[in-house]
């Protein structure tokens, strides 16, 4: 069988993996698996419905039910945790490279095991992946590394963060600010956890202005899950 990864590249993660270019003909008779995508509007490649069978694997609330088969588990920290559980339970042969990427997915979605979604099962499955042969230290060090311009943007966020008496915080990143720091919307994902390092902050939102004037909102919480 032939397996292709379809979708848009995330610029900050291309060091880890890049998407494949897929012709329309590849969808003929294909099994399409959509991961970590709660609603159809967020699916990168709109050809997802052109295959023979569609599976949804996700850990967000199942508000948009789609697919011929849907596996949604809101108790999981991530789609990576779910896939790891499936591989372990069914005793699939898991390559070292696959284990590395799944481990990175769990680390990323749990904020390095800091978020409330981290369970005992999450840690057991991460340990199972860690038993595979990949450079754990290099991977996690790379995931924790930021460019100088992102570091400067993080400083701006700390300087301009508004925090109320309930521990709710917000900061607005306008197009002007993005241009000043030479940062794209996608690159702001690297600083989404920054406000959470402040002891008086319980939940926070980062409002990123888009080129068309709309805002992308990144919401996070230390205690209560946000979906």
Predicted features, each with a name:
Residues 30-33, 53-55, 203:
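Structural motif
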Residues 1-14, 28-29, 108-226:
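Hydrophobic helix-and-loop "lid/oligomerization" segment in the mid-to-C-terminal part
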Residues 44-61:
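A short, gly/pro- and small-residue-rich
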């Amino acid at each position: 069988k032939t397996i292709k990864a379809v979708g848009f590249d995330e610029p900050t993660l291309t060091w880890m993996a890049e998407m494949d270019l897929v012709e329309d003909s590849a969808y003929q008779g294909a099994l399409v698996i959509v991961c970590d995508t709660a609603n159809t509007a967020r699916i990168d490649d709109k050809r997802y419905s052109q295959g023979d069978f569609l599976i949804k694997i996700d850990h967000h609330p199942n508000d948009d039910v789609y697919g011929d088969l849907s596996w949604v588990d809101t108790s999981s920290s991530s789609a990576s945790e779910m896939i790891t559980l499936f591989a372990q339970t069914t005793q699939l042969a898991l390559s070292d490279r696959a284990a590395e990427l799944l481990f990175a997915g769990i680390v990323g979605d749990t904020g390095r095991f800091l978020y409330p979604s981290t369970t005992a099962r999450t840690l057991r499955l991460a340990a199972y992946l860690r038993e595979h042969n990949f450079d754990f230290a290099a991977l996690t060090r790379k995931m924790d590394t930021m460019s100088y311009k992102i570091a400067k943007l993080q400083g701006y966020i700390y300087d301009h963060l508004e925090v109320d008496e309930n521990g709710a915080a917000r900061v607005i990143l306008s197009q002007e600010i993005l241009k000043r720091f030479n940062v794209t919307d996608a690159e702001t994902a690297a600083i989404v956890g920054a406000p959470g390092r402040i002891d008086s902050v319980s939940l926070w939102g980062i409002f990123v202005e888009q080129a068309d004037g709309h805002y992308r909102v990144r919401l996070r919480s230390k205690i209560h899950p946000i979906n």
